[in-house]
From Swiss-Prot:
Keyword list, A-Z: Amino-acid biosynthesis, Cytoplasm, Diaminopimelate biosynthesis, Lysine biosynthesis, NAD, NADP, Oxidoreductase
HAMAP family assigned to the protein according to its UniProt record, in alphabetical order: DapB (MF_00102)
Source species of the chain: Clostridium perfringens (strain ATCC 13124 / DSM 756 / JCM 1290 / NCIMB 6125 / NCTC 8237 / Type A)
Protein name, UniProt field: 4-hydroxy-tetrahydrodipicolinate reductase
Enzymatic class: oxidoreductase
EC number: 1.17.1.8
Entry annotated with the keyword Amino-acid biosynthesis: yes
Matches recorded under Pfam families: DapB_C, DapB_N
Length: 254
C-alpha cells in the first residue's frame, strides 16, 4: 500500500484525488492532508502546515499553489521521502530551487499530469522540427476564470518543448498587441480565461496552403488526478535523489 500525504487536499483537485484514490486505486491510501482549510470533510486528518504532520507516509503529493514550494521541500528533506509537485506558476527562482533540491531528494515535477498532454508534448518533439521551416507556430491555452497564473504551466511546457526541439533560435511572445509584422522566429502563446473551462491547449502550425492543429481538451479533472496517483505509485519506492517526470511514469521516449 502506497501511503500519501496530499497537500491542497481541501481544493477542487484535492477532492477529486481523494475520491479516485478511494474508488479506483486500491494500492494507494491518502493517510493525511495539508491545507489552510482544516475543516473539510475527508476520511483522514488534515494539518495546517507540513511540519504539523506526524503521520507515517511514502510520498508527499502537492496539488496546490507555487507559494507552498519551500515548506514542502524542507519537509521532504527532513523525512527523506519523495516529493511530487503538480502545481504551476513557479518563478524562475522557484525552478532553480527545484533543480537544486532534486540533488537531495527524489523530486517529481510535471506542469500537467494528464496522459494525453504528455503524449502531445512528446509528439511535438518530432513534429516541430519537420514543420518549422514552412509553418508559423502559435499556441492558445484556455482555462477557467479562477486560474491565477498565465500563461498556464502546460502552455509553457509545450512552447519550451518546441523551442528545444528546433536548431533555430526562437523567441516566445505572450499575446499580441499593436502594429507589427510577425517575425519568422516568433512562437506566440495566447491566453483565454473564462467560465469553467478545465483546460484546453491548442498548438497551431499555420502554412500558406494548410493548417495543422494539435489539440488537447480536458473534460474532467479526473485525468489530472489519475496521472497524479500513477505518479505516487511510481515514486513510492524511489530513494535516489534526482528529477522525475511523467515521461518516466509513462515510459515515453519517442
Amino acid at each position: 500500500m502506497v501511503k500519501v500525504i496530499l497537500n491542497g487536499c481541501s481544493g477542487k483537485m484535492g477532492s477529486v484525488i481523494s475520491n479516485l484514490a478511494e474508488t479506483k486505486f486500491p494500492n494507494v491510501e491518502i493517510v493525511a492532508g495539508i491545507d489552510n482549510n482544516t475543516k473539510a470533510q475527508r476520511p483522514y486528518p488534515i494539518f495546517a502546515k507540513p511540519e504539523d504532520c506526524n503521520v507515517s507516509y511514502d510520498v508527499l503529493l502537492d496539488f496546490s499553489r507555487a507559494d507552498a514550494l519551500k515548506s514542502l521541500v524542507e519537509f521532504s528533506k527532513k523525512t527523506k521521502k519523495p516529493l511530487i509537485l503538480c502545481s504551476t506558476g513557479y518563478t524562475a527562482e522557484d525552478l532553480k530551487f527545484i533543480e537544486e533540491s532534486s540533488k537531495e531528494i527524489p523530486l517529481f515535477r510535471s506542469a500537467n499530469m494528464s496522459i494525453g498532454i504528455n503524449l502531445v508534448n512528446n509528439l511535438l518533439k518530432k513534429v516541430a522540427p519537420v514543420l518549422y521551416e514552412n509553418f508559423d507556430i502559435e499556441l492558445v491555452e484556455r482555462h477557467h476564470n479562477q486560474k491565477v497564473d498565465a500563461p498556464s504551466g502546460t502552455a509553457l511546457l509545450l512552447a519550451h518543448t518546441i523551442q528545444d526541439s528546433l536548431k533555430e533560435e526562437t523567441k516566445l511572445l505572450y499575446g499580441r498587441e499593436g502594429i507589427a509584422k510577425r517575425e519568422k522566429n516568433e512562437i506566440c502563446v495566447n491566453t483565454v480565461r473564462g467560465g469553467g473551462i478545465i483546460g484546453d491547449h491548442e498548438v497551431i502550425f499555420a502554412g500558406d496552403g494548410e493548417v495543422i492543429e494539435i489539440n488537447h481538451k480536458a473534460i474532467s479533472r479526473d485525468v489530472f488526478a489519475i496521472g497524479a496517483l500513477k505518479a505516487c505509485e511510481y515514486m513510492a519506492d524511489k530513494t535516489k535523489a534526482g528529477k522525475y517526470s511523467m515521461d518516466d511514469v509513462l515510459q515515453l521516449n519517442f
